[in-house]
Amino acid sequence: MPVLRRFALPLLLILLLLQGCTLSRAQIRRADAMVAASADRSSSCDRTDHCAIPSPLLAAATEAFAASTPQQPVHVVTLLDDTEPALAARINLVRAARRSIDVQTYIWDQDDAGQLMLDELVRAARRGVRVRILADQLSSFNDPDLLDRLAWVSPNLQVRLYNPTFHKARTQPLEFVAGILCCFMQFNQRMHNKLLLVDDAIGIAGGRNYQDRYFNWDDAFNYIDRDAMVGGPAALQMAASFELFWNHPRSLPLTHLRDVNRRILTERAPPSWPAPHYRRPTRVARVQEDAEDPAWLQAWLVDASLRVGQVEYFSDLPAKTDKPDKRRALEFTHHIMHMIGEAKHEVLLQTPYLVMSKRAQHIFRTLHRRAEPPRVIVSTSSLASTDAFAAYAMSYKHRKRYLKKFGFEVHELKPHAPSAGEDYELANLGMPATHLPSKVAGVRPFSETRLHLLGSRGSNNRPAPLQSGGMRFGLHAKSIVVDDAFAMVGSHNFDPRSDHYNTESGVIVYDHDFAGQLRRSILRSTQPENAWVIAPRQPKVPMLTDINQAIGSFSESLPLFDLWPFRYATSYDLKPGCQPLRA
């Protein structure tokens, strides 16, 4: 009886919440009819090209399509490491779109970066381009009033939310708990894909969401992240993947969301779309100017592009699951594991969360047992640079396994690393424009509460406090280079969540030059000035060391966190020119 009483209230609350989970067909039809009748149909353009701007990026993609054959595809690929080019490329492509724009993302906040992209998409819709936005509900648009305004803004703009909790745009704390208790498997399955696709010809895929910290605009903590821009036949794979997600039952239109539907039905007149209110309008104006500056685009994006052959876009299927009869849903995950398992000489891995799934552990253990195992270099987060403490704790627990059984060379990012990338230098050192590469001299550099499960989710997630001040950076890039032959840039964290629950996507480029570019980018983050190296402690008393390691191994085998305080390995500042200690 006491047990029943303990769970009676939570169960009652869940039942009350579930009673109003779905709308009636009549409510949905009525909201659809109201939006169709009263949506803003004004147009800012009457030209057949919908007033698209000229774009060297879209032009290069069109040329790649023209040069391609089924047997010999041609692609143009650009590695987007630095944040200003990554944001300017998006704006340029949105403004250059003539027919369609499809956006898929995990997080969309209403800070400067989020407002900027949303306003650009609204403008594109109003000049006649079909715009579709698909965002994961738990981490995006936590404002039913905003979504109500978007529903009326233009017939050319459609928004859907993936896997909304109890068919609502906003998840309250009690609903979050109820979602875990009543339907954990579905609640836990999130859409982690990131994609911007323009005219089914060129797309950007990778790790960046629409939030300030992904573009070096947060005042205190920003991410080192990465995308790849791909023009050519692989864009058709992107389009096919987006259609699967867009038409899946878990992707709900705005009129199907209870809190948005209620606002639509009670509107006396369609709400207007307000001008964005930027916290720092100067930097927004700057990147908007860069997005249409031919010299800037040439220096930062066109000159950095590579013309390559085979490129593939992979994505897991919607409603991904680890059930045996649904294995096809894990298509991208399977392909990544196969890539790594075929390595001959070197695997270079960058991930913010070094928490290996059982399948990944098996692959790396098998590689390390070879007579001549490949070298495995890992770039990941440190405790000082992460904002996902639970994930780091799990990584910390398995250091001995990673070093001894898998042969990893682990480098953990420092929070103030001065040269992990161009953005790092500009943000931390206040580098003036005269210090930029000569090809871009004079170019101006960039000087809400979220409920979640594990990992990075929102702008209120902050890293551990440090005694040192200044701008801090964390790692969010997810990439692999295998044998300098092919490379992957995507959203997959190589952890159990990415393996079994989140849908993931990314591009795989089969080109030596691109693999070399990506390899150099990752290795820059592992340099002594940018990262600590993880290596075994030096034994002081052999017998005590053996006892300590035995206890440590037992503690590591315990569920969840490892409580033994005397660790097998620790962090070192590696002296330049020296090799780290080996297990």
Regions found by a protein language model. Give the residues of each.
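Structural motif marking the loop-to-transmembrane transition
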Residues: 4-5, 14, 184, 336
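Bacterial N-terminal signal peptides that target proteins for export
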Residues: 1-9
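Bacterial N-terminal signal peptides
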Residues: 8-19
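Charged, low-complexity intrinsically disordered terminal segments
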Residues: 21-194, 198-583
